[in-house]
Amino acid sequence: MNPVVCAFGVIFVVVTLELVVAHPGKDVLGCHNGTSITVDECCAIPMLANKTVIEKCKAAHPFKPPQNTDDKGPRGHPGECIAECIMKGMGALKNEKVDGPAFRKAIEPVVKANPAFAKLLDDTVKQCHESINVDSEFTRYVTKPVCKADAKAFINCVYGTLFEQCPTNVWTQKDGCTQLKDKIKKGCAYFALRKHGGRRMRPT
């Protein structure tokens, strides 16, 4: 790996981890500031995972306050466990790593039913899979959490990219939608900009 790229990656990961640790539960990037609209209202991205799998995983990993508040023990977020569970249910997580080709195979019915997203989904899955593989190399020495963050990062990457490049015939020209694109480009997670209780997979 190029030493410059490696060094940049390490710096990025360290800074990101410091932000997360130093500001637990805070909206560091201002993702919710001045936002009155949700991503659901701007681009109707199809549900990629089976609804039964999603509901089963949400029931198995409910959102609740962490038991450890003394910064001891493994760190984790229920969203990471839900995402990991969903990816396993889709057969897209093998040996604790995201399997891009398996994910693409699992969403084939969705691709066929949504031709507007077909080409975009192919490119997005490949791009996000490659990105997650690089990030995993940089973070593999971090203290092991309850659930790996790779699955959650991959799903957020896929949906975030689909939103940023939403097909014109699906995109809704509403005030605030372009602002949401800018927020995602800045680093806000797609699922952090969704409505609560939505019908699609929600790992954050």
From Swiss-Prot:
GO BP annotation list: sensory perception of smell
Keyword terms: Disulfide bond, Olfaction, Secreted, Sensory transduction, Signal, Transport
One Pfam family this sequence matches: OBP47_like
An example molecular function term from Gene Ontology annotations: odorant binding
Chief place of localization: secreted
Keyword presence, Secreted: yes
InterPro entries documented for this protein: OBP47-like_dom (IPR054577), Odorant-binding_protein (IPR052295), PBP_GOBP_sf (IPR036728)
Subcellular location: Secreted
Biological function: Present in the aqueous fluid surrounding olfactory sensory dendrites and are thought to aid in the capture and transport of hydrophobic odorants into and through this fluid.
Protein family according to the UniProt entry: Belongs to the PBP/GOBP family.
Name used for this protein in its record: General odorant-binding protein 67
Gene: Obp67
